[in-house]
Amino acid sequence: MAKQRLQQVADTMQRILGEVIQTELKDPRVGFASVTKVEVSADLQHAKVYISIMGTPEERATTMAALQRARGFLRKRVAEEMRHMRFIPELHLIEDTSIDYSLHINDVIRQIQHERMVNPPRIDDEQ
């Protein structure tokens, strides 16, 4: 299948899933979660859905477990919105930790900048 078509399907699924998670899921265990990316297999049988979750590790685990239990509902809602597709991919939910990693890198950079301000590097006059 053409890459452009796969990307269109992935983008549409990302939009639908993001809206459904934010507005239609009534499970109180689902915290603040957003769909960051969807990758669809070439045969449209599988879709990796990357989800970013804010909160403590326990809250993130609880939210991810609740979303896993809601996979059937999520897939059904995608099917209702994408009626033109013959098959709807099986959803594989994956926690996206790239935002956490980038926040960690920013913290490390800030710490290094702070240390350089407090203890500037010495330049020896003698060479």
Curated annotation (Swiss-Prot):
Keywords: Cytoplasm, Ribosome biogenesis. GO terms for molecular function: ribosomal small subunit binding. GO terms for cellular component: cytosol. It is found in: Cytoplasm. GO terms for biological process: maturation of SSU-rRNA. PANTHER family: RIBOSOME-BINDING FACTOR A, CHLOROPLASTIC-RELATED. One of several proteins that assist in the late maturation steps of the functional core of the 30S ribosomal subunit. Associates with free 30S ribosomal subunits (but not with 30S subunits that are part of 70S ribosomes or polysomes). Required for efficient processing of 16S rRNA. May interact with the 5'-terminal helix region of 16S rRNA. Belongs to the RbfA family. NCBIfam families: rbfA (TIGR00082). Monomer. Binds 30S ribosomal subunits, but not 50S ribosomal subunits or 70S ribosomes. HAMAP family: RbfA. This is Ribosome-binding factor A. The lineage of its organism: Bacteria, Bacillati, Chloroflexota, Chloroflexia, Chloroflexales.
